[in-house]
Amino acid sequence: MPKVSVIVPIYNVEKYLEKCINSLLSQTLEDIQIILVNDGSKDNSGNIAKEYEKNNKDRVIYVEKENGGLSDARNYGLKYATGDFIAFLDSDDYIEKNAYEKMYNKAIEENADYVECDFIWEFPDKIRVDKQYPYKNKKEMLSFVRVVAWNKLIKRQLIIDNNLEFPKGLRYEDVEFTYKLIPFINKFAYVDKPFIHYVQREGSIANVQNERTAEIFTVLDNVIEFYKENNIYDEYRDELEYNYARYLLCSSLKRMCKIKDKAIREKLLTESWERLNSNFPNWKENVILKTVNIGKNKYMRTVNKSTYKIYSKILEII
């Protein structure tokens, strides 16, 4: 059995794919399985991936499917994974050569079924290291985790036992997957090194804002419903309320303000405020918001209906 299975969804990334795959083939960890999932690419990505499989049959599996989006490709790759742990890597990103060895060893040393590392935002003209919040328990993790799939090592059995998968057809797939995963983690660990290079490029899904930005509403509602169905909503209510407010007042607000169509932009901004205050009318009394002094919280404490409109207008022009 491989120690780690790495799932790489591929869609029209011929310019970046070789660097990504080469970084995986250079891993110092032995017994690694690399699963390349061609999600209906229309460029030369499929041929590039096939060639890697041909020359590395002991480590590389190439599969292809009709285009279904990032979530669908990851779920498809999970069917072929046989490793003790699962990792995900986007096909335009790359990873330091000792990443999975360090993360796997940390998992074994601490008997952890979930391991995180730091990562590097890589812009055309600069880089920035993103360090994890030093949370001490799962409640803190739920509030402050970086909701990305690719800086994590996850016990495969944890995913199987809890029937976890990425939501097909939705943006913010990492939000839903990560928040559904956290309650089932038995022990988590952290490697204080920035192993992942998160490459920023124009035209990527993460940098395109349109009416699909509204899918954050569906994802957040899916998460809340999941916690209720599993009878853990009351246990994590403060964290879920905090996240609901944080997304709609911070990260998603920024994205909505960058939508070029004015009618769509204003509709979503109004809906965002109304949803927050309908689902969590007392969100300003949230214990995490009131007691944790980080920048976002200081800003959120000042928000009311009037200042929300002012902040929105400012974000539209900066």
Where do the PLM segments sit?
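Residue-level recognition of short, structured coil/turn motifs
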Residues: 57, 111, 186, 231-232, ...
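Short, hydrophobic secondary-structure boundary micro-motifs
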Residues: 129-131, 236, 285-286
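Catalytic core of nucleotide-sugar-dependent glycosyltransferases
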Residues: 195-201, 207-234, 250-280
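Hydrophobic alpha-helical segments that form the core
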Residues: 244-250
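Membrane-interface aromatic/basic loop that binds lipid-linked glycans or pyrophosphate carriers
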Residues: 259-318
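Nucleotide-sugar donor-binding/catalytic module of glycosyltransferases
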Residues: 1-221, 225
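All-alpha amphipathic helical-bundle segments outside canonical DNA-binding/catalytic cores
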Residues: 233-243
